[in-house]
Amino acid sequence: MRARQAFFTKQLAWLQDTNWWQMLGYAWLVFIFGRFAMFLLPEALKPLLDKPLLALPLLLIVAKDLVGIPDFSRRMRQVARKGTPWSERLGATLPPEFLAFLKLGRAMRQGFLAWVRRQPHPARPAGAVLTYTERGAYSTVLAFAVFSACIELPIDAAIATIFIDEPRVRAILHVCSLFSAATILMWVAGDRWMVRGAKGHVLTGDALDLSIGARASGIIPLDAIAGCDNLTEKPDLWCKRHGVARRDTVTVSPFDAPNVVLRLRPEAPVTIMTYQMATQAPACVFLYLDRPELLGAAVRRSQEA
């Protein structure tokens, strides 16, 4: 009985820790592998397993939806007051990740327009800049994204010409491919403009000002940091070893694996925005820094003072 309860608790924690975008990705993979399995199964089994294999991705989505009922009820109570705009009521019915994605897209478009207009970057506070792009993979990832977007157009055009005879369908696919490539390039330009303006996180006299463009922001008072440790393993392994739930942590990194973990004091809660979604009072913050020793030294000086 205890083993069964422990298994159920573990699966429930996994559903809670997995965000909606990850769950949709898992459901898509299950669907693809299910369709591939149908080609390999004997003809006698295909009619029996076709519908169950199609239902598996839906079961993942339903399970995630059921786990989110308490959070959904809390959001609906918050917007139940009189005078709440209808747009806010409608937004409360959607998972927070979906609304955050819409906000992120708007921020990327604004960054792209600012880059086109050559607008000045917003001012950052005075202090020591902790960079994260000089030694990391940020430039490499952006270059790969630009290359992928450019190479996608001729490849999609060739595939559509070979396999699709209907001119109207080919034209629709060409437009979709062009829109996809243009969106990728717009996001790359907007993100680069905002990250370049941020320059890095800023360590002021009493706080750590986090900023990775529109993808992460927040202010952590140095007094709220209980400890700063170098991270030499995956965050999931670190959380398991220290008994910290993954959903009680937040990762602030452009694209690299975190190399620093900040342990925060529960009596001094902070709010950190990641991908336009707020995480309130996280227990730990995983960071990537080009020179993590600078942050560690500042935290130690703050604790000694």
PLM feature segments, named:
Residues 30, 56-63, 143, 147-153, ...:
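Lipid-exposed faces of alpha-helical membrane segments in multi-pass integral membrane proteins
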Residues 281-305:
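Polybasic (Lys/Arg-rich)
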Residues 186-232:
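Conserved beta-hairpin
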